[in-house]
UniProtKB/Swiss-Prot annotation:
InterPro entries: Acetolactate_synth/TF_NikR_C, ACT-like_dom_sf, Arc_rbn_hlx_hlx, CopG, CopG/NikR_regulator, Ni_resp_reg_NikR, Ribbon_hlx_hlx, TF_NikR_Ni-bd_C. It comes from the Bacteria. Belongs to the transcriptional regulatory CopG/NikR family. Ni(2+) binds at H79, H90, H92, C98. Binds 1 nickel ion per subunit. Its cofactor is Ni(2+). This is Putative nickel-responsive regulator. The lineage of its organism: Bacteria, Pseudomonadati, Thermodesulfobacteriota, Desulfuromonadia, Geobacterales. GO terms for biological process: response to nickel cation. It comes from Citrifermentans bemidjiense (strain ATCC BAA-1014 / DSM 16622 / JCM 12645 / Bem). Transcriptional regulator. GO terms for molecular function: DNA binding; DNA-binding transcription factor activity; nickel cation binding. Keywords: DNA-binding, Metal-binding, Nickel, Transcription, Transcription regulation. It holds the Pfam family RHH_1.
């Protein structure tokens, strides 16, 4: 980690009040830590948009396991991407519905494509990709 540098920020007083409320709600120790976190989040988002950097994400799926061949199709997708899908958690929500959380690692564009394929399988009730970073390059 590099040397800490102090700098000033000018902003509208209402925006600052809103920011201070956010800091309190999120439990940040101070404005500096909140700003650092915002910058890191923007960096991660940019990396995902560019698509070339290594990233990691979770794909969350909710589906009815009684739908014909759905479980098999999802399993086939997972096996087709066994190098990128590094972990899977399967939860029985009730007698019919399942929750599956997959951890996917790879180039951001590949992770997004895999997530889209899984979420797009007919019979998936809800799916969501949550993208994050491997932590490499963040300070």
């Amino acid at each position: 980690m590099g040397e800490t540098v102090r700098f000033g920020i000018s902003m509208d007083d209402q925006l600052l009040e809103s920011f201070d409320r956010l800091i309190e709600q999120k439990g940040y120790a101070n404005r500096s830590e909140a700003i650092r976190d915002l910058i890191r989040a923007a960096q991660v988002e940019l990396d995902w948009e560019e698509g070339e950097k290594e990233g990691v994400g979770t794909v969350t799926l909710v589906y009815n396991h009684h739908v014909r061949d759905l479980s098999d199709k999802l399993t086939e997708h997972q096996h087709a991407h066994h190098d990128q899908i590094i972990s899977a958690l399967h939860v029985h929500l009730d007698a019919h519905n399942c929750l599956e959380v997959l951890v996917v690692r790879g180039k951001a564009r590949d992770v997004r494509r895999i997530a889209d394929e899984l979420i797009g399988v007919k019979g998936v009730k809800h799916g969501k990709l949550v993208m994050t970073t491997t932590g490499e390059g963040l300070h």
